[in-house]
Amino acid sequence: MSRIGKLPIKIVDSVKVDIKDNIVTVEGKRGKLSQELKSSIKVRVEDSNIIVERSFDDKQTRAFHGLYRSLISNMVKGVSDGFSKSLTISGIGYRVEQQGTSLFFNLGYSTQFEYVIPEGINIRLDGNTKIAVEGIDKCRVGQVAAEIRGLRVPEPYKGKGIKYDNEVIRRKVGKSGVKK
């Protein structure tokens, strides 16, 4: 049995779970998410817990068992608490500003980057060097944060670029002078 898949998912009081035709819908105070399941995975609600089970025991179904359990768990956490990722911009003249539903980045290039904020994602700016990406879908929050980071990945010599708050940049030593 999958070690992750066999664990029950606790349902918070403010969350409502609906299962119809292999589609799990989770609704909470922050919004509504749904996930379509493979036919080999079955889900049931029992005593304020969600139980994920599989009908076959082949390798792929065992992998999907743990995957869908994690996805449903993230849906429950997302609609009740939400997810957040923080990014920091470091470098001389590097900054970000928000205009409507777009972010404009000055990252040391000759042109300014425009990033359109997708639906269902909230962006908070703290000054012009800190970005907080928030939303109910963990996958989309991580994807948006990765796309923003990808605009200027931190370089290893001075650490300039966009990095996650908890990320440690491996630094390299620069060129040493000519020895005589």
UniProtKB/Swiss-Prot annotation:
A biological process term (GO) from this entry: cytoplasmic translation
InterPro entries: Ribosomal_uL6-like (IPR000702), Ribosomal_uL6-like_a/b-dom_sf (IPR036789), Ribosomal_uL6_a/b-dom (IPR020040), Ribosomal_uL6_bac-type (IPR019906), Ribosomal_uL6_CS (IPR002358)
Cystine bridges: none
Keyword terms, alphabetized: Ribonucleoprotein, Ribosomal protein, RNA-binding, rRNA-binding
GO molecular function: rRNA binding; structural constituent of ribosome
SUPFAM superfamilies: Ribosomal protein L6
A GO cellular-component term linked to this record: cytosolic large ribosomal subunit
Job of this protein: This protein binds to the 23S rRNA, and is important in its secondary structure. It is located near the subunit interface in the base of the L7/L12 stalk, and near the tRNA binding site of the peptidyltransferase center.
UniProt record similarity statement: Belongs to the universal ribosomal protein uL6 family.
Record's subunit section: Part of the 50S ribosomal subunit.
Protein name according to UniProt: Large ribosomal subunit protein uL6
Source species: Borrelia turicatae (strain 91E135)
UniProt gene name: rplF
